[in-house]
Amino acid sequence: MSAIVDIIGREILDSRGNPTVECDVLLESGTMGRAAVPSGASTGSREAIELRDGEAGRYNGKGVLKAVEHINTEISEAIMGLDASEQAFLDKTLLELDGTDNKSRLGANAMLAVSMAVAKAAAEEAGLPLYRYFGGSGAMQLPVPMMNIVNGGAHANNSLDIQEFMIVPVSQPTFREALRCGAEVFHALKKILGDRGMSTAVGDEGGFAPNFGSNDECLSTILQAIEKAGYRAGEDVLLALDCAASEFYHDGKYQLAGEGLQLSSAEFSDYLATLADKFPIVSIEDGMHESDWDGWKLLTDRLGKKVQLVGDDLFVTNTRILKEGIEKGIANSILIKINQIGTLTETFAAIEMAKRARYTAVISHRSGETEDSTIADIAVGLNAGQIKTGSLSRSDRISKYNQLLRIEEDLGDIASYPGKSAFYNLR
C-alpha cells in the first residue's frame, strides 16, 4: 500500500509573478510527488473557483495562503493514510470534503495541487513515468502542438481582439520534427517583425504581441513566416485561432475594437467563415460567447465539418456542460484545462466523454503557468492527440515541450505523431 504520510502545501509564484499553490505528497516508502497549479487570465464564468485571499495589501489580493492552509489542515487530515494509487477514491474524498458544486470552499487550486501531487507520488512509487501511469501500455501517441506565436486580447497589450494566433505543424513524422518546425517559424516571424520595425516583445504565453492593423494582416504575416522558414502553409503547417469571444462580447454584439466592427452572432459566424476560406485554418476556439449557444449552433452548422470548433469557456472541462453540448450539436471539440475542474479524475472523465462522442480533446496550459509539466504526460497518457502550451519562448512553456521530447525518446520506435489525423472528425 502506497500510504500517504505527509502533505505540504505552499505558496509559490507563477509565470506572471502572481501567487499559486504547490503541494508535496510524501508516501510511506519515502517517495514524493510535487505539483504546482496554473491560473488563467480569460476565464469561463462556470470554471471551478480558485481560492484567493483578497487582501489588498498583499500581492494585490491574489495571495493563496487560505488555499495552502486548507491543504495543510483539512485536506491533510482527510487523506492522511490513504493509498495514493487509488486516485478516483482520493479525488472523491476531496470532492466530498469541499461539498460545493464549484469547489469554492476549499478552492480548486488547493484540490488540484493535491490531486496532481498524489498521482506523481503514486507513479514514482510504481516505478513508472507519469504518462505511462496515466495511460498504461496504450500510451504511445504524441500530441500535435498548437503553438501560439502571436498573442492578442487579454494575453497582450496590443490592438488585436483575437487572443491567440497559432501554427499547427502537421506533415512531420515525429514530434521532435514538429517542434523544430514551430521554432523555425517562430524565429522567421521574429525576423519579419524586426525588419518592419514592429515589436518583438512577447505576451503571457510567449508569442509576439505587435500592433497589426487587422486579423487579416496578422494571419498573412504568419503565412509569410511559414514560407520564409521553408515550409508550405496549408500542407506542412496549418493555422488555428483562439478568439476568446466572451472577452469582446458586449450588449449582444461581438465588438472587434481593433477593426471597428460590431457584429451579431450570424455576422461574426460569417466573419470567421471568411477567415477560414481565406487562410488554412484548421481550428477555432471559443468562436462565440460562452452563453451564446444559438451563435454556437450557427457556427457549428456553418463550419463544423471543415474546422475544429473548440469549446473552452463554453465547456470549462465539465462533463455536465459537455454532455449538453454534445446533445445539442454544439462545437466538435473540447479544451481540457485541469484547473477549470479541479481534480484529475474529473479531467480524465471529460476527455473520455469527448472521445466517445467523436469530439476531439485538446490538452491546454493556462496563461499563468509554472515549470510543472504534468499536462504533457496527460496528453500522451490519454492519447489526446493535441496540446496547446504556448509559443517557442519562456521556460514555463518550453518545459512542456521538453517533457514531450523526453517522452518521445522514452517511447522509442513505438512513438507516433498523428499530424493531420489528429483532426479526425473533419472532412
Curated annotation (Swiss-Prot):
GO terms of biological process kind: glycolytic process
UniProt-listed InterPro entries: Enolase, Enolase-like_C_sf, Enolase-like_N, Enolase_C, Enolase_CS, Enolase_N
Binding site for (2R)-2-phosphoglycerate: 163, 337, 366-367, 388
Keywords noted in UniProt: Cytoplasm, Glycolysis, Lyase, Magnesium, Metal-binding, Secreted
Catalytic center residues: 205 (proton donor), 337 (proton acceptor)
Note describing how the cofactor binds: Binds a second Mg(2+) ion via substrate during catalysis.
Pfam families found in the cross-reference section: Enolase_C, Enolase_N
Positions annotated to bind Mg(2+): 242, 285, 312
GO CC aspect terms: cell surface; extracellular region; phosphopyruvate hydratase complex
Subcellular location: Cytoplasm; Secreted; Cell surface
Function summary: Catalyzes the reversible conversion of 2-phosphoglycerate (2-PG) into phosphoenolpyruvate (PEP). It is essential for the degradation of carbohydrates via glycolysis.
Protein name from the UniProt record: Enolase
Species of provenance: Burkholderia thailandensis (strain ATCC 700388 / DSM 13276 / CCUG 48851 / CIP 106301 / E264)
Species classification: Bacteria, Pseudomonadati, Pseudomonadota, Betaproteobacteria, Burkholderiales
